[in-house]
Each structure stands twice: as C-alpha cells, then as structure tokens.
Amino acid sequence: NGIYLKKGQNTVKITMSWGYFSLDYITIEKMSASNAYTAAENLVDPYASQSTQRLYSYMKDVYGKKVITGQYCNGGLNGTEFKAIKSATGQTPAMLGLDFMRYTPCRVQNGDTSDAVEKAIEFSRAGGIVTFCWHWNVPDKYLLSGTDGGNPRWWGGFYTKNVDRSKFSLTKIMNGSDPDGYNTLMSDVDEIAKQLKRLSDADVPVLFRPLHEASGGWFWWGAEGPEPCKKLYRLLYEQLTNVYGID
C-alpha cells in the first residue's frame, strides 16, 4: 500500500476506521511503482455466458483508466446508503455489493431471511453491476457455547472466534480426514448454488467474491493458513462451475 504525494508540501491525516487504532510512529519512505496487473485475455471458464463475457470485457476495457464506484447496501437500489450517496452527489454507484450470508442453512434454520437475489436482479436490470460476498456460517454444531457480546454465536458464525476449533478443522475437511464436515460444507454450497442459479436464470452476471479477507485469519476459512483455503476455493469453483453449471 502506498500514498501518492505531490511535489512540495503535503498534509497527511490519520483517521480511525473501526473506531480505534494503535500507533507508535510514522515513517515516510520512497517506494517503487507497483507492478500493474495484466488481466488474462479470456475467462477461465470457456463456457461463460454471454453476459459474463460482456462484463469481463468491460472491466478489462476500463482497467487502469477509470474507477468503478460501488457500495454495499442490503436495501439495494433504493437502500439507505444508495439514497445518501445520490443525495450528496447526484449520482448512483455503478456497482451494488450484496451478501449471500442469510441464505446459509445455519442462519435460515435460526430464522434469518434474505431478499438479496431480488435486489441484485433489480439493480442489474437498472444497468448496474452486481457483486456478492458470502459470510459463510459454520453449522451450529461447530459453534462454541454461550454468546458473543450478548448475541447468539450463530449471529457471527463466520468468525473464527465463535468456532469450536476442537470440532471443526478446515485442514481435516480438505484432506479427507473429516468426511462428515466435508459433506456439511457441500450442503451449504448447494444452497448458495441455488441462489446463483436464480441469478444465472435471470441473466445477471455476478462478481462473486467467496472466502474474502482470508489472509486476516478472523474468518474460519483463513484461520488455518493459505493451503486449506486455496483448496476450498478451487473446490468451490469446481462445484459451482462444473457440477452446478453456473457460468
């Protein structure tokens, strides 16, 4: 990460992100230019839908030239954040971020509901780009007992701190030592595949961002290092693309 400073006098401000920060000192050093990423000419999936190919082509065309503005907003096109941005700027973000979290079986069993797919279809038909992440809950049987900050553990069941690591190990699941855990995760994937299929049937291409922020370790999919996470990522691709036919 770097900060571009113009020649002459500059003012650098440090602001809080999550409401707190720890700071010992600041060092300013010259850094070399970052290597520009070169996007592959073609998608990995040779059978990608026409809509997916058009979106990929557009993103390649604007890469390094323009910035695509986006906003996560559960309410979609007419949600609180989008209304605030439109009021302040007169413009609507080009990209809407949503979450498959509330479609996860563990959360559904605890009474959670979602209309994220409907919001995505609405936004796409209005001409926008849709991206999804997935805060993937582990099933209740893998959660610690008690509560987390007064909330039931399942409410934050994607956080490593809420998972009983003596019962759940992604490493064991991915190396074949825990077939029951593997089948359980695949059942979750099946449910999310149904939602992706709904989007595919509506001709809505999605920038899907599963297993996000894995390097931090605060989510269970990144808590045991890169190797099991990479295996799970590849498995997700194989299942969603080759088994469920989502292109």
Feature locations, PLM:
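Surface-exposed substrate-engagement region within the catalytic domains
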Residues: 4, 10, 82, 87, ...
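Boundary/entry segment of secreted carbohydrate-active catalytic domains
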Residues: 31-87, 92-95, 99
